Regions:
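Extended hydrophobic/aromatic-rich secondary-structure runs
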Residues: 1-19, 127, 364-366, 375-380, ...
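C-terminal beta-signal and adjacent terminal beta-strands/loops
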Residues: 167, 308, 363, 392-476, ...
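Short helix/loop capping segments that flank catalytic or ligand/cofactor-binding pockets
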Residues: 51, 60-62, 185, 339, ...
Length: 561
């Protein structure tokens, strides 16, 4: 065969036809509730409301997802039989996308009650209590039902007698709350789960494997939180908004822990993590201009959240991949914190080199990783928010909204594959960055893009006989080095609209209540780190490729009769 045909058979995943994906899901849910409400007033100004009830919920989800390859819809909806021996990549594709059957049952039993006291709509106190039980927890009866409760209060200052005559104050209030909440993930179970597989033609036996190890002590994730806020509205509501501060402490967070493979699995779900979140939220709305024909409104919102792992509950050392992808839960650091190799330079042959990767006798894995990796940041932003404006003149309205994000770091998409990089086949695309690659001795002084080569650059290629594994090869290290980390801060024009409402005279001609024409556009403009070079900062990946937010344009005509 010609070289191109040999390459095609070796590399092509789907030589003929397309994919036919069948998805069949059924969800059956039942809910039964009994509730009693009682409210009474005494001494004219005092109001008490009491609610008590119980609720039972059951939800059964069953689904089947299958993918068939070689589908020819234009040829009688037939399938091509493809030989996986001749087309090995096709065989890998089929193995990586097996048919999936989902069958889950979730049962929840709840009791709840509320007590509310209201004095002249001036002082309001509320107390809530609830107990939920779920089949997602273990045999320990003390862990099945978690009583969660909260107490909150509100002081409407604008209802006070000394502020009743302040005409410019429409509303001014303080509020606060304290309580305990519980959470359960639908993916968790205390029971031993065995995944029944298909038939193995080699051993002539059916295949089964452990999916989840049993944990009878599995219990609710608990969060203790408090918040304090101020709500206000002044000048006939032309200036209004709110400010809130909060703090949340999570306990018994469910995390994945590595266990000995002799148990039949490599991980186990445990209540072992503690997490703290604190921050504030601000919302402000202003109407600077409001006349008979013109209205101009501004709005802005922002939020800052700081999270920190106070306890990980993990005694087993993490592998290097957990540090790279941000899944390592490290006390004192934020969740989703990731680390990178320390890029040094290109050598005289155009190959990447890295700092502090030499192995020292007697060094532990944790100590080695602390030397090899550099802190890169977190994938979760510290500050998020947006601001916008709306302007209307008679029947014409124009508006837009910007969103922003600060404090996050992201990886650039992988530049090399795990076996290096070579010149592509004519039908393949290539990253534009390779235009500035190393091509000849001396180029290492002008570029940080390595040479095109088939050298796998494994750890022995780096000249290191490793006892503690820090990477699969040098190309993985380059892709996940601090050189390939960029700021995720951005300012985006999220949407823009223009709308025109036709006059009542025109509407009456066709007996319509309202006629309007509108144009809307989303994701029109982006200000971000130049280092991204077209990669979208909201395309949060750690080396993989995903589809960024796309721009869209809509022209519509709305008629209401």
């Amino acid at each position: 065969l010609p070289d191109s045909d040999i390459w095609r058979e070796q590399q092509c995943k789907l030589p003929y036809g397309g994919e036919l994906v069948n998805t069949d899901t059924r969800n059956t849910s039942y809910t039964a509730r009994a509730q009693v409400d009682y409210s009474f007033q005494f001494l004219e100004d005092h109001q008490i409301t009491v609610v008590a009830g119980t609720e039972a919920r059951s939800s059964k989800y069953k689904g089947l997802k299958s993918t068939e390859y070689g589908y020819l819809p234009d040829r009688g909806e037939k399938f091509v039989e493809i030989d996986p021996v001749q087309w090995p990549k096709y065989g890998d594709l089929v193995k990586s996308h097996p048919n999936v059957i989902t069958n889950t049952l979730t049962n929840v039993m709840s009791w709840y009650g509320t007590f509310t006291y209201d004095y002249m709509n001036r002082y309001i106190v509320n107390f809530n209590i609830r107990a939920d039980g779920s089949n997602k927890f273990g045999q320990d009866k003390s862990n099945r039902f978690l009583p969660i409760w909260s107490v909150s209060g509100r002081w409407n200052l604008h209802e006070e007698a000394f502020l009743k005559e302040v005409m410019w104050m429409n509303m001014f209030a303080f509020r606060g709350s304290y309580g305990i909440q519980g959470n359960v993930s639908p993916d968790q179970t205390p029971n031993l789960l065995i995944q029944l597989g298909s038939f193995d033609p080699i051993s002539k036996q059916y295949i089964s494997k452990l999916s989840k190890l049993p944990n009878p002590q599995l219990r609710w994730e608990k969060t203790t939180s408090w918040n304090f806020g101020v709500d206000f509205a002044f000048l006939d509501n032309r200036l209004n908004g709110s400010v809130e501060v909060y703090r949340k402490k999570g306990k018994d967070q469910i995390i994945s822990k590595e266990v000995a493979s002799t148990t039949g699995s490599t991980t186990m779900q445990l209540n072992a993590g503690n997490l703290e979140n604190k921050g504030y939220e601000i919302v402000l709305n202003v109407v600077p201009v409001k006349t008979k024909d013109i209205t101009w409104a501004l709005n802005i919102n922002g939020a800052r959240n700081i999270n920190k792992v106070t306890k990980s509950g993990i005694t087993t050392d993490y592998g290097y991949k957990e540090y790279l992808d941000g899944s390592a839960v490290i006390p004192g650091e934020a969740l989703n914190t990731f680390y990178s190799y320390k890029y040094d330079r290109l050598d005289a042959n155009g190959l990447p080199t890295f700092k502090d990767i030499e192995e020292t006798d007697g060094i532990t894995q944790t100590e080695m990783f602390a030397k090899v990796f550099a802190y890169s940041g977190t994938r979760v932003p510290d500050i998020t928010g947006g601001f916008g404006t709306d302007i209307s003149y008679k029947n014409l309205a124009i508006g837009g909204f910007f969103s922003y994000s600060l404090g996050t770091k992201i990886r650039l998409n992988n530049l090399y594959n795990d076996s290096g990089q070579r010149l592509p086949q004519p039908q393949q695309n290539m990253n534009q960055a390779f235009v500035n690659r190393w091509k000849q001795p001396g180029d290492e002084n002008r570029t940080d893009i390595p040479v095109l080569t088939t050298d796998p650059l494994d750890m022995y290629g780096l000249g290191i006989d490793r006892k503690i594994k820090i990477a699969d090869n040098g190309w993985e290290m380059y892709n996940k080095s601090d050189l390939r980390v960029a700021s995720g801060n951005y300012l985006r024009l999220k949407n823009l609209y223009v709308r025109y409402n036709f006059s009542d005279r025109i509407c009456h001609k066709i007996r319509a209540q309202m006629i309007s024409v509108r144009f809307e556009a989303t994701n029109l403009w982006l200000l971000a780190d130049k280092k991204l070079k077209g990669q979208d900062p909201e395309q949060v990946t750690l080396g993989g490729v995903s589809t960024p937010p796309t721009s869209s344009y809509t022209l519509g005509l709305d008629i209401t009769f």
